Regions:
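Active-site metal-binding loops of divalent metal-dependent hydrolases
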Residues: 72-75, 160
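A long, amphipathic alpha-helix that forms part
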Residues: 6-20, 27-68, 213-215
């Protein structure tokens, strides 16, 4: 992260730089371990705020016009409990890689049904599990209705705050986790900008890409030689 910040400072001081994308990940790690600890998280937010102010001032000294947009890609949900979905599936008379395939993430289980009968058995096995199968409409709303089912033919999403343990991600739960229903209040992301966003409404995380693309296209038009 320090290397990213140093590169951003160097770019901000370069008059030929027109767009900077700065990625930081320290806050994500802190929230996984210290979700709900306002003192710990507050100190990191203050540090980021200071970095943003310094970057903005530095860029303003070397450019006529400067705008700054800060956004996050997800929230963080406190741990409420764990669920062993894999154990429920392993009890079935099904062969992994022959009848079905599965990937156990921290908050969801993704399934591919290699034999038609496997779907009914797996669905029944998780009937009492705390969560729900994502509907096709939900997948479309969330932007994950991929026709090739690359990321799951069917996805079982846990209720907010629960974690699959053990999973393909971890053997022990973390105090905080993300990857739940984006409509849950702890899943909300954030966006702050010195420039109005009326020309590019941001409704979900995927819109951040469109926003950056739009700003880059605008810069290209503004700097295009006559």
């Amino acid at each position: 992260e320090e290397a990213n910040l140093a590169a951003a400072r160097a770019s901000a001081a370069d008059p030929d730089t027109s767009f900077i994308f700065l990625y930081t990940a320290k806050l994500d790690g802190l929230l996984h371990q210290h979700v709900g600890d306002d003192a710990v998280i507050g100190r990191q937010l203050d540090a980021y705020a200071q970095e943003c102010r310094e970057l903005f001032r530095l860029a303003a000294r070397h450019h006529d016009q400067v705008s700054l947009t800060v956004f996050s890609d997800h929230g963080m949900t406190p741990l409420k409990g764990t669920v062993d979905l894999k154990a429920d599936i392993d009890k079935l008379n099904l062969r992994f890689g022959v009848d079905y395939s599965a990937c156990y993430d921290s908050t969801m289980a993704r399934f591919w049904f290699l034999k038609p009968a496997a779907q009914a058995d797996i669905t029944a096995a998780l009937a009492q599990a705390p969560g729900h199968w994502l509907s096709q409409e939900e997948m479309r709303q969330f932007g994950i209705a991929f026709p090739d089912h690359k990321f799951g033919e069917a996805i079982f999403l846990l209720d907010s705050g629960l974690q699959i343990i053990p999973s393909d991600m971890a053997l022990k739960p973390l105090p905080g986790m993300h990857g739940y229903d984006p409509r849950d209040r702890d899943s909300h992301a954030a966006i702050l900008s010195t420039r109005p966003l009326d020309d590019c409404q941001v409704r979900d995380v995927a819109d951040f890409f469109h926003l950056m693309r739009k700003r880059i296209d605008q810069l290209k038009k503004h700097t295009r030689p006559n």
